[in-house]
């Protein structure tokens, strides 16, 4: 009796000259819907959790544009009818997990029946010598509720600042076409 992943998709820009975050997210969402055998109109909530967009665009909300592009219940829903609510969730690396938590709660309460989470990131366009080059990527997941499976049932997060000195992270860089990129 929990939230389950109905389908998932992930893709890269496949060599597009100037990939656009919106188009990558559109493609990931459409692929994910196809994997699940669902229609865009089946989606009750669409959350975009991507961070890096071309030209560092912040407005309008990318989720609303993706909703429009894939055709998920456009316009105002009729009174008592079905619609899709969409919004951007900017929570860094935790964005997708936070989106799962939000949609799981709404699935558990019966407010939504199918949730979609998309994320796409492209280089925001601040290329200069030594800049990190992001590989344009996108992903999408569809969440539903299943009475037979445990799925996602509880979420809990906690931070322990007294242990922050135990965390270490790093990247190995290499030169490629005049830019430093992660190996």
Which positions does each model-derived feature cover?
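Extended hydrophobic secondary-structure segments that form protein cores and membrane-embedded regions
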Residues: 46-48, 85-90, 118
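Conserved catalytic cysteine-centered active-site region
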Residues: 53-113
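Conserved "HGTGT" condensation-loop signature of ketosynthase/thiolase-family condensing enzymes
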Residues: 1-51, 55-58, 64-75, 145-183
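Short beta-strand segments
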Residues: 115-121
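Short-chain dehydrogenase/reductase
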Residues: 22, 93, 132
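Short beta-strand scaffold segments in enzyme catalytic cores
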Residues: 138-143
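Hydrophobic alpha-helical segments and helix pairs
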Residues: 120, 131-134
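A generic local secondary-structure boundary/capping motif
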Residues: 104-106, 127-132
């Amino acid at each position: 009796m929990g939230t389950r992943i109905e389908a998932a998709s992930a893709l890269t820009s496949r060599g597009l000259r100037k990939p656009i975050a919106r188009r990558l997210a559109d493609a990931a969402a459409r692929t994910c819907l196809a994997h699940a055998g669902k229609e865009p109109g089946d989606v009750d909530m669409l959350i975009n959790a991507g961070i890096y967009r071309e030209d560092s665009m912040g407005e309008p909300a990318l989720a609303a544009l993706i909703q429009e592009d894939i055709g998920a219940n456009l316009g105002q829903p009729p009174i008592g009818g079905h619609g899709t609510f969409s919004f951007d969730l900017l929570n860094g690396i935790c964005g997708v997990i936070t989106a799962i938590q939000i949609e799981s709660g709404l699935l558990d309460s019966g407010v939504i029946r199918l949730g979609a989470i998309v994320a796409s990131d492209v280089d925001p366009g601040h290329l200069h010598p030594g800049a990190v080059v992001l590989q344009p990527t996108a992903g999408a997941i569809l969440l539903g509720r299943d009475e037979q499976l445990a799925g996602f049932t509880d979420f809990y997060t906690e931070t322990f600042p007294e242990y922050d000195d135990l965390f270490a992270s790093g990247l190995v860089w290499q030169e490629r076409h005049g830019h430093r990129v992660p190996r």
